[in-house]
Amino acid sequence: VLRALEPISATSDPAKLSKIYGSRFAKAWELLKEKRVKKYVFNPSGRVMWIVVGKEREYLIYPAVGYCQCDDFFFAVMDGKALACQHLIAQRLAEELSDYDVVEAEDRLFDSLMEDQRRLMLPPREV
């Protein structure tokens, strides 16, 4: 997945990226333009968490390993049917273009945000 994201840089031609990633690039571009890519910076540790706000929920992105929590990543990217999901593409574009919102928070909030993300990954429980 990381190798699949290599073509994305600040000087990349959008038409070329559209050919490489297809409709996922267009969706990623919309996420970028709608300011849905968030870089959380926790202080004083300096830890960073990337979140892309999707239509249904927020997705935790691990850019260093090329991972996203979304279903498209799990079903299409992991099966080799797609190079990357729209959220990973959007995060990479945002970082390369320095076009993202920075959210600064205290370190004590990191664990609760991670717990929220973990809860979102669990299947719904029956009542």
What are these regions, as identified by a protein language model?
Residues 1-127:
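Long, low-complexity, compositionally biased intrinsically disordered regions
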